[in-house]
Structure formats: structure tokens, C-alpha cells
Swiss-Prot record:
Single GO MF descriptor: ATP binding
The protein's name in its UniProt record: Potassium-transporting ATPase KdpC subunit
GO cellular component, one term: plasma membrane
Record's keyword annotation contains Oxidoreductase: no
Organism: Gemmatimonas aurantiaca (strain DSM 14586 / JCM 11422 / NBRC 100505 / T-27)
Location of the protein in the cell: Cell inner membrane
């Protein structure tokens, strides 16, 4: 009996050692050595305190900040422990009503007229996208500039500086990281004595 069990037990133990300890240890070590920031979650710090991750979207609702994509992750959205979409199809009346409500909110809050970029009123598959399109950022410039008493041209330039182009010039779409942009806004307000930063 043991003669037949021994090879299976040895193989199981070896595979547990390789796949459970050696391989993860090597990958973790290589990641910490080559890409320490990414390996630790792409965390963003402000004054020595972690304020978020460049990979996880956050809720911004006040007029002096750029707003990210809507979220369906968790009961109230933006729940990193419940990443996911709403799973509602295009014919679902609840989804249509929710999008219409978001459109109204964008129009009222930002005084927007004309077309609204889809990523500003629809949640992503993960519900935690950290980025918005440059068009969505441009749509919010006037509101943010007014709330912070900044020239619109200054805010527009800041958006351009925080726009990431396509990878290798062809992969993906240009995008703006909302958290990084909002932190840059705070830094700009802090260094401009004539600017009132609304908290």
C-alpha cells in the first residue's frame, strides 16, 4: 500500500513546495527588486501618508475636484473588496434610468451642453477604473476652475500634463488618472496665494 502511496505523497509535497513557496517567493522577490512601487500596489503618498492607489478609482463629488467614472462595485460603489460591474444589460430599464440620472447630474453640476463622454456616465467592468478620458476631463475644467478660482487655461494645462498617451503609440486610449490630477490641483492651490482651495 505505502509502496503505491509514497510516489504520490512525494509528488504532492514537491509540488506544494515549488508552487506554494519557491515560485511565489521568486516572483515576489523579482517584483520587489525590479518594480517595487507596482509590486506594492502603486500606492500614492501625500505628506508621508498613503492617500490611495493609482490603480483604484475613488469617489470625488465636490465641485473643486475632477470626478472619475461611476462605480457599481459594492452597495455604494468604489468598494475595492467588491470589484465588479452591475451586470445589467443594455435593455435593462434600471440601467437606462441610472445612466439618465448621471447625465442629468453632469449637466446640472457642470453646466454641460452637448455630448457627454460615455465614461463619465457609465461604470466599468471592474467598477474601480482610476482613469477617465481626456474628453471627460476637459468637460469638467470649467467647473473645477470656477470652484478653485483658477484660470481655465491653467486647469486645462494641468489636465494635459497628466494625460497619459497610448502605450507604444497604438495600444489603448489616452487617459487621465483622476487621483493624480486632483492631488496636483491641491498642490497648485497650496502654492498659489490668490487661490481658494475648497475642502
Amino acid at each position: 500500500m505505502m509502496q503505491h502511496l509514497r510516489p504520490a505523497l512525494v509528488m504532492t509535497a514537491a509540488l506544494c513546495l515549488i508552487t506554494g513557496i519557491i515560485y511565489p517567493g521568486l516572483i515576489t522577490g523579482a517584483a520587489q527588486l525590479l518594480f517595487p512601487a507596482q509590486a506594492n500596489g502603486s500606492l500614492i503618498e501625500r505628506d508621508g501618508r498613503v492617500v490611495g492607489s493609482a490603480l483604484i478609482g475613488q469617489r470625488f463629488t465636490t465641485p473643486n475636484y475632477f470626478h472619475g467614472r461611476p462605480s457599481a462595485a459594492g452597495a455604494d460603489g468604489y468598494d475595492a473588496m467588491a470589484s465588479g460591474g452591475s451586470n445589467k444589460g443594455p435593455t435593462d430599464s434600471t440601467l437606462a434610468a441610472r445612466i439618465a440620472e448621471r447625465v442629468d447630474s453632469v449637466v446640472v453640476d457642470g453646466g454641460v451642453r452637448g455630448r457627454i463622454p460615455a465614461d463619465l456616465v457609465t461604470a466599468s467592468g471592474s467598477g474601480l477604473d482610476p482613469d477617465i478620458s481626456p474628453a471627460s476631463a476637459a468637460l469638467q475644467v470649467a467647473r473645477v476652475a470656477q470652484a478653485r478660482e483658477l484660470p481655465a487655461a491653467t486647469v486645462t494645462l494641468l489636465v494635459a500634463q497628466h494625460t497619459t498617451p497610448r502605450q507604444l503609440g497604438v495600444l489603448g486610449e489616452p487617459r487621465v488618472n483622476v487621483l493624480r490630477l486632483n492631488l496636483a490641483l491641491d498642490s497648485l492651490s497650496a502654492t498659489s496665494p490668490s487661490v481658494r482651495s475648497v475642502r
